[in-house]
Regions:
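Active-site metal-binding loops of divalent metal-dependent hydrolases
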Residues: 22, 184-185
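Conserved active-site-proximal phosphate/metal-binding subdomains
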Residues: 158-180, 186-337
Length: 337
């Protein structure tokens, strides 16, 4: 039985399960597979390398699915010339994308662009936030849906270290817009828990990285299946730019350098280890120890590499069973002997 939440109604999807845009693996193929399975797949446009290549990838995504999909625009600080974010945004608008996910820095400027340009064809906006404080700001800016990312998440979990058991409950207290629970979500029991806490659905990243449709090499996926919930590293904490990645040889080196340098730690100390060029080379070579790559604590709940359809079916079935059987049974009176 499909779940009926504010998210499913607003986005026109069957299941309240999103796969947010991700660096490297947020491809049209993965987004289409998630959307075709009844969720919302999101293509990360910056993966294309340029706005015009992004345009072609959006068109290719449209050829792969007739279901709703989203496009991610992540705005991050840059040590060199920043990416052409406004050009990416214009491509998204010109290609008639209906759902946009933003992440990173404040989306205010781009929200204005999307709202102004969409006219009658309203663009639904989702923004990833790592705290209720940031989520409330996003609501004021006019974001339609909040992706509330707990400390368990891959990538950038923020600096406040609030896990989802508290964060989602606070979201339910404070937010008026629909929101999804993001970070560490890999199972249907967690979907049921998120709904119980007040979320309207879940966003899964790491879980969909370990699928057949993800473009990551098998060596990465194998390490995820073998991994435990303790096999991630928080790096760059001293720079207030915390990032959660898989615990491999490179991540361990970064962790050791950061610890040894203490208050004198500087990004230059590890730039040669964490730069994107090295990470991309490791991915292309299938070397799971060659560079850093993101993974959330949910890897401890991943034990196979199924298709996106199988992930979706299993999560929905588990969530329904948890609610109908496990939770309802706790309220049923027991016979007394």
């Amino acid at each position: 039985m499909p779940f009926d939440t504010r998210i499913t109604r607003m986005l026109g999807i069957e299941h309240p399960i999103l796969c947010g845009g991700m660096t490297g693996c947020g491809t049209p193929e993965l987004a289409a597979a998630v959307s075709n399975a009844g969720g919302l797949g999101v293509f990360a446009i910056h993966n294309a390398g340029s706005p015009e290549k992004g345009r072609l990838e959006i068109r290719r995504l449209k050829s792969l699915t007739k279901k709703p999909f989203g496009v991610n625009l992540t705005i991050l600080p840059s040590m060199g010339p920043p990416p052409p974010y406004e050009e990416y945004a214009r491509v998204i608008i010109e290609e008639g994308v209906k759902i946009v996910e933003t992440a990173g820095s404040s989306p205010k400027l781009f929200l204005q662009m999307f709202k102004k340009a969409s006219g009658a064809n309203t663009i639904i906006t989702i923004h990833k936030c790592v705290s209720v404080r940031h989520a409330l700001s996003a609501e004021r800016y006019g974001v339609d849906i909040i992706s509330l990312d707990g400390f368990e998440c891959a990538g950038h979990p923020g600096e406040e270290d609030i896990g989802n058991f508290v964060l989602q409950a606070r979201g339910a207290q404070a937010l008026t817009k629909p929101f999804v629970c993001s970070g560490g979500v890999s199972t249907g029991t967690q979907l049921a828990a998120a709904l119980a806490l007040g979320a309207d659905g879940v966003n899964c990243g790491t879980r969909f990285c370990a699928t057949q449709e993800c473009n990551w090499p098998d060596s990465f996926k194998d390490r995820m299946v073998q991994g435990k919930e303790t096999d991630t590293v928080l790096m760059l904490r001293r720079l207030n730019n915390t990032c959660r990645v898989f615990r491999n040889n490179v991540a361990t080196q970064v962790e050791e350098i950061e610890s040894e340098k203490g208050p004198d730690f500087d990004f230059g100390d590890v730039a040669h280890l964490v730069n994107g060029k090295r990470g991309r080379a490791a991915e292309q070579q299938g070397d799971a120890d060659g560079g850093i790559w993101s993974a959330g604590q949910g890897i401890g709940l991943i034990h196979s590499v199924p298709s996106c359809q199988q992930v979706m079916d299993q999560m929905v079935e588990e969530a329904e069973h948890t609610i109908k059987k496990r939770l309802v049974s706790l309220l049923e009176p027991r016979s007394r002997l």
